[in-house]
Structures are given as structure tokens and as C-alpha cells.
Design a protein with these regions (language model features):
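ABC family nucleotide-binding domain
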Residues: 1-224
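C-terminal boundary and immediately downstream tail of ABC-type ATPase nucleotide-binding domains
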Residues: 214-215, 221, 225-244
């Protein structure tokens, strides 16, 4: 489904070159839930953004559903149609209702008729647990509700894979659970998911594999049971002692 080979992403400034992602090779299979953890600045979010073409890779290879993003002639917009992404910030249109937020991309990108787009939006609002909010505006919603709208909006495009970039980090603690529950349901339904998060409980419970990154490198990976109980690398052990 997703494969990266020796993926590197550099940023240059003040005469220095920084490797935000430094030679990451990984393979994510269909219906697999992969959780990426690591300290701040480890390259987790940059790696995720490379998968959706939001960051241009410096070198290496990204293949999503058979399409090679490292080939310059690749139409990234076609790839993005198949890859949903949910960010830390909800990025909803403040001047549009919840329903309109979910309908817009369906009509513009998927070319769906209004009636079909509305039906899809209402079904997804039911799925994420806020069907009664379709006429509300984002400012009237809690952070957890806004993030659930953002998830519904991404799902409305019928993606083959969902990317989550720290989806709960901007939420008040009591709202984290409602968003994680929606993500757990997606995992149970077989959605291919790559999740950058600090929620270790979610990683233990839902992930098929956990990837640990530090200083742009993939340091260690394994099943949750193996990763959390028998980590092999000293850097992994130190990180887990600090967060668990």
C-alpha cells in the first residue's frame, strides 16, 4: 500500500543542512494500522507530510498504491484523492456550516452531485457521532467535535489510506477520548492508517506496528507487545522510560 525507500528530506538555512527525515525505509500493508512515535523534532510529522506530497522529498522513493511519488511527472492531486489527512489543527472553513465543510471537496474534487454529497456527509456525521451538528458553524463546536468533522471530511473522499498528524494534541484532555474512539472504529473497519501520536495507550491497543523515530531516523519498529515490553535499542528504552 505504502512503501518508502531510503527517504530523505532536508531543510537548509543559515548555512546548515538539517536532515528532518534521514533514510527511512518502511512498508505499510493494506488495512494495517501503523503508529509513529518519537520525541518532538524527530521527523515524524515531516515523514507523514512527505507521504501526502505536502513536503517534497529530497531523495529516495515513495510508492503509494503502486504510484511512485518520486517521479516528477506524477500528478500529486490524483494521489491525494486516495490519501486522507487529518492535522493537529482542524482547518475547517469558519464561514461554512459543518455540512458544507464536508460537502465542498466532494463536489469540487469528486464531482459529486449536491444530493449525493449531502447524503454522504450526513452518513459520516452519524458515523463520527455528531449528526445533530450539521447546521452548526465550527466556532460553535468543541475541539473534539471539530476534529471529528475534520475526520468526516477526509473520509468523504473515500480514501484508501488515512494519515493522522497528532490529531489529539490540540485538544483538551477530556475531548481526546471521543476522537480516539472514532479512530479505533476506523481501524476495526480495516482502514489503512498511519498515525503520528503521543497517545501511548492508543498505540498499544490499536496499532499493528509501532515505529520509533529519532533525529530523522527510524530507530526501531515492532508489534506493540514487542515494542513496549522488549525494546531492543537503548534510545527506544530511554524514550519509553520518559513517557510511560
Amino acid at each position: 500500500m505504502i512503501k518508502t525507500v531510503d527517504l530523505k528530506k532536508t531543510f537548509t538555512g543559515r548555512g546548515q543542512t538539517v536532515y528532518a527525515v534521514d533514510g527511512v525505509t518502511a512498508h505499510i500493508k493494506p488495512s494495517e494500522v501503523v503508529v509513529i512515535i518519537g520525541p518532538s523534532g524527530s521527523g515524524k510529522s515531516t515523514y507523514l507530510r512527505c507521504l501526502n506530497g505536502l513536503e517534497t522529498l529530497t531523495s529516495g522513493q515513495i510508492i503509494i498504491d503502486g504510484v511512485d511519488l518520486s517521479v516528477k511527472k506524477t500528478d500529486l492531486n490524483l494521489v491525494r484523492r486516495e490519501v486522507g489527512m487529518v492535522f493537529q489543527q482542524f482547518n475547517l472553513f469558519p464561514h461554512k456550516s459543518v455540512l458544507e465543510n464536508i460537502i465542498l471537496a466532494q463536489q469540487v474534487v469528486r464531482k459529486r452531485k449536491r444530493e449525493e454529497a449531502e447524503e454522504k456527509a450526513r452518513m459520516l456525521l452519524q458515523k463520527v457521532g455528531i449528526p445533530e451538528k450539521e447546521d452548526e458553524y465550527p466556532i460553535r463546536l468543541s475541539g473534539g467535535q471539530q476534529q471529528r468533522v475534520a475526520i468526516a471530511r477526509a473520509l468523504a473522499m473515500d480514501p484508501k489510506v488515512m494519515l493522522f498528524d497528532e490529531p489529539t494534541s490540540a485538544l483538551d484532555p477530556e475531548m481526546v477520548g471521543e476522537v480516539l474512539e472514532v479512530m479505533k472504529q476506523l481501524a476495526r473497519e480495516g482502514m489503512t492508517m498511519v498515525v503520528v501520536t503521543h497517545e501511548m495507550g492508543f498505540a498499544r491497543e490499536v496499532a499493528d506496528r509501532v515505529l520509533f523515530m529519532d533525529q530523522g531516523k527510524l530507530v526501531e519498529e515492532g508489534t506493540p507487545e514487542h515494542f513496549f515490553t522488549s525494546p531492543q535499542e537503548e534510545r527506544t528504552k530511554l524514550f519509553l522510560r520518559q513517557v510511560l
